[in-house]
Amino acid sequence: MTVAFKLEGQNFTALNGGPHFKLNQSISFFVYCESDKKIEKIYNKLAEGGQIIFPLDKYDWSPRYAWVVDKFGLSWQLDVDKINNQQKILPAFLFVNDKVLKVKEAVNYYSAVFPDSKIIMEWPYDKSAGLPDETLLFAQFKLADHLFNAMSGTGEHIFDFNEAFSFVVNCNDQKEVDYYWNKLTSDGGNESQCGWLKDKYGLSW
């Protein structure tokens, strides 16, 4: 079964994919709630039957923030901050393990592939972290006029990008399909079936 729906004016599609791939924290939705009332309402709803990674509280990076895995296994990051854009729900990538140093590289790569791209914000680690210079903790960027967040997570993690979560590129013709297919499967990407592919960082398209 395939279900198409909208949240905050944004298009989503849900598929019945069977037990082969599990949603995990490597990809989440980052929601800019813009008010205490809204973040509390969303947090309480998503936490029902789910798992709280970061409880709703004040943190160094936000006056009110939470990270929740809902009862279906989908991860949500909630931030009370405002965003100067109509898009309030942003896909967020978490680069971990052998990819922890690759946020900047990946953001530059995707920005070169997609039109109407722009790097909006880059937040590097403090030098005290002992990581190479310019290693990014957080980045926000735009691809084809859609906003995304990317983060890195130090330490060992038991999850990584997989096919449970993929991104749909609506193309105008076969020439455009071929362009994205060739770009995203190059340099270590892999072809899959039925129009799916996995790029060199493990993200599915």
Feature roles, as predicted:
Residues G73:
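Short, contiguous alpha-helical
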Residues S28, Q51, P55, Q77-Y125, ...:
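N-terminal beta-strand motif that seeds the catalytic metal site of vicinal oxygen chelate
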Residues I39, V103-V107, E134, Q174-V177:
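A structural signal for well-ordered alpha-helical scaffolds and beta->alpha junctions
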Residues K6-N11, K22-L23, S28-Y65, A112-V113, ...:
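Vicinal oxygen chelate
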Residues M1-L23, W76-L78, P124-D160, W205:
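Conserved short beta-strand elements that form part of the metal-binding/catalytic scaffold
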